[in-house]
């Protein structure tokens, strides 16, 4: 024992009374971890609906991306369980396609929970039985730790065989009021079978003398070990032959039987041989692919989920555990088809996990797939990444995840899902489409439930890096990712209907890549990284200023730039405005005025929230401005494409060299991807 008695039950009670230690179940701890800091909860709009973003899940270098609905469902479930609701008798099961982040989310949650419990004020404590040589029936075993990491407060509530005596002890030695004691007893659990058995032995040896009984205990922190599976532990489904209930519950220990005088002592069961006991003291048990387990293990889970008990040969050990599981769609559907297994599903809070459908957020996930380490070729030379690679890969995989809908095209759906402008289509239209799709009884037909997952993206990137073109050119060229994704479709997507849809989606992604390259080429031609952005904003400011009252005969309009706050002058060029609108297919005055009104409306809504908003998400407008500037304003061999394709004269060669130089020094290209991008631009491939 420490000199200050820090390992005694009395000291622990004193710390709980002073608020330095806590007595709470796993759901209360998890709810406090997520909800304690209100500044870490933000209201956001996702797919046209208001929801909450819990910032604790966005902490760390490699944190959870998106999953707003899934996280909200989980937090709601935990909060309900913490408040004594029905969720405390359920498991939270994430069901979805492979590679959509289910396991990553649970692993992140477990990591956050371990970090949370590592703080002194949040530590979990348990107790050891000691001086067992006095009892005499435990052989050479002198110290035994609570097998299920029971809380010292549970020990205090079971200190005497009489509940009233235990309450009197808490009042006298802990200094707790009657209300506080009643609050503790709302979370009352009996001691586990072996702890209760040992406790009775100690009571008999000590003649029920409380002071003597207390000398046989010491309070210790629960070890926070990821590798040992304490506090957070994972059980992955195994094949039918090697798996057994022992993996979850534990089994009889021959070594212990050699020491124990009484063969009926429940301590003969080594519970820590199983995964559940190691997380029984306020921990999280993660069952990966729960419905892949054979039937007897599923029945074990049914008992554990419902009763929160480990049960062997009639002996019971109450546990304080949050059970989270995952399953892929096919295994879950197969399991549902077996009607006799319905009770376990009835005890689960099923959460269907969709793929990420926000291409802006997908760019973070694509970075995860590419990796943070510096890439090298097979000959150990530095491997450059095309600045358009992330965008190309992200839009391609996101488009495969978007279902077909009559009200929206796939591009409109993608833009709206990312919170961007999609012509005249509003976010409400997307919300309506999602609502209709989410009423489908077939889960895979719901919004975002089917498509290329993160693992498929990883495979495509691996295929890209292993090609001779990538290694010889020392660059991961963006256009090549489409070929790699098509290879993944042929090799890994077995259903013909899905494969045909995904090929169409990748074709659409190629078209978007083409438009991106048009913009990049214009920026390179103008020797300015944001040239097209400036021209787009010129058009927007011109159509706002064209009806201004203070517009003089010289067509000069002065306005305050919302980004810098400075006063700027702009000459209204009606020819330029008309050219852009012709490219947009606006032929009548009514059509033009309607489009201008929509742009002004967007400007008013967006600029007030984000002064840096630049309309670059409006694909049609950006494309029209790019076309006007590239195909109308540029002299030379008829167009920029002609000039770059025909470099037989000095002027065209100088233009080519200047653009290559700009791409190398200002736009983040290497010589390989700069040359390949210009070559692709000149071929007119993937033009809509």
State where each predicted segment sits:
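Conserved ASCE/P-loop NTPase catalytic core
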Residues: 1, 7-688
């Amino acid at each position: 024992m420490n000199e200050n008695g820090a390992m005694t039950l009395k000291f622990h009670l004193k710390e709980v009374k002073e608020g330095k230690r806590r007595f709470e179940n796993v759901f209360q701890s998890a709810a406090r971890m997520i909800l304690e800091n209100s500044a870490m909860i933000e209201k956001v709009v996702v797919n046209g609906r208001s929801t909450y973003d819990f910032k604790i899940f966005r902490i760390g270098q490699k944190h959870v991306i998106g999953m707003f609905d899934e996280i909200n469902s989980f937090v709601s479930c935990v909060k309900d369980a913490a408040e004594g609701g029905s969720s405390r008798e359920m498991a939270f099961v994430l069901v979805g396609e492979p590679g959509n982040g289910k396991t990553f989310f649970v692993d992140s949650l477990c990591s956050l929970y371990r970090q949370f419990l590592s703080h002194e004020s949040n530590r979990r404590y348990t107790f050891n039985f000691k001086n067992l040589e006095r009892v005499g029936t435990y052989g050479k075993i002198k110290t035994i730790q609570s097998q299920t990491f029971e809380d010292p407060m549970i020990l205090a509530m079971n200190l005497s065989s009489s509940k009233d005596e235990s309450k009197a002890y808490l009042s006298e030695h802990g200094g707790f009021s009657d209300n506080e004691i009643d609050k503790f007893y709302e979370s009352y659990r009996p001691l586990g079978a072996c702890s209760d058995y040992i406790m009775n032995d100690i009571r008999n040896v000590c003649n029920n003398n409380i002071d003597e009984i207390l000398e046989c205990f010491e309070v210790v922190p629960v070890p926070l070990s990821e590798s040992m599976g304490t506090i957070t532990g994972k059980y992955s489904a195994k094949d039918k032959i090697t798996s057994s209930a022992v993996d979850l519950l534990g089994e009889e220990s021959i070594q212990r039987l050699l020491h124990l005088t009484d063969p009926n002592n429940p301590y003969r069961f080594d519970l820590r041989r199983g995964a559940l006991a190691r997380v029984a003291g306020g921990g999280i048990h993660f069952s990966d692919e729960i419905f892949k387990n054979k039937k007897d293990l599923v029945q074990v889970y049914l008992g554990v989920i419902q009763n929160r008990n480990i049960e062997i040969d009639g002996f019971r050990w109450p546990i304080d555990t949050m059970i989270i599981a995952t399953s892929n769609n096919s295994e879950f559907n197969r399991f549902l088809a077996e009607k006799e297994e319905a009770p376990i599903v009835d005890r689960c809070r099923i959460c269907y996990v969709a793929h990420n459908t926000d291409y802006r957020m997908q760019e973070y996930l694509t970075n995860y797939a590419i990796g943070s380490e510096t890439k090298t070729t097979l000959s150990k030379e530095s491997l450059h990444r095309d600045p358009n690679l992330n965008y190309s890969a992200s839009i391609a995989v996101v488009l495969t995840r978007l279902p077909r809908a009559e009200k929206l095209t796939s591009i409109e759906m993608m833009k709206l899902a990312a919170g961007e402008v999609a012509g005249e289509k509003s976010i409400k239209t997307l919300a309506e489409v999602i609502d209709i799709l989410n009423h489908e009884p077939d889960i895979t037909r719901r919004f975002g439930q089917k498509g290329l997952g993160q693992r498929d993206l990883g495979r495509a990137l691996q295929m890209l890096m292993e090609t001779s073109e990538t290694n010889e050119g020392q660059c991961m060229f963006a256009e090549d990712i489409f070929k790699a994704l098509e290879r993944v479709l042929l090799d890994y997507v077995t259903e013909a209907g899905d494969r045909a849809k995904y090929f169409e989606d990748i074709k659409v992604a190629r078209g978007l890549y083409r438009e991106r390259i048009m913009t990049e080429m214009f920026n390179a031609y103008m020797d300015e990284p944001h040239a097209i952005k400036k021209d787009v904003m010129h058009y927007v400011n011109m159509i706002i200023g064209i009806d201004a009252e203070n517009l003089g005969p010289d067509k000069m309009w002065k306005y305050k730039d919302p980004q810098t706050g400075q006063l700027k002058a702009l000459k209204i060029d009606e020819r330029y405005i008309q050219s852009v609108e012709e490219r947009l297919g606006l032929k009548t005055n009514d059509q033009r005025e309607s489009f201008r009104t929509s742009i002004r409306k967007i400007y008013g809504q967006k600029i007030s929230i984000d002064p840096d908003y630049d309309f670059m998400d409006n694909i049609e407008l950006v494309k029209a401005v790019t076309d006007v500037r590239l195909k109308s304003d540029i002299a030379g061999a008829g167009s920029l494409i002609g000039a770059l394709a025909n470099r037989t004269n000095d002027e065209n060669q100088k233009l080519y060299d200047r653009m290559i130089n700009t791409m190398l020094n200002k736009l983040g290209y290497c010589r390989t991807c700069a040359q390949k991008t210009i070559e692709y631009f000149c071929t007119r491939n993937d033009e809509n």
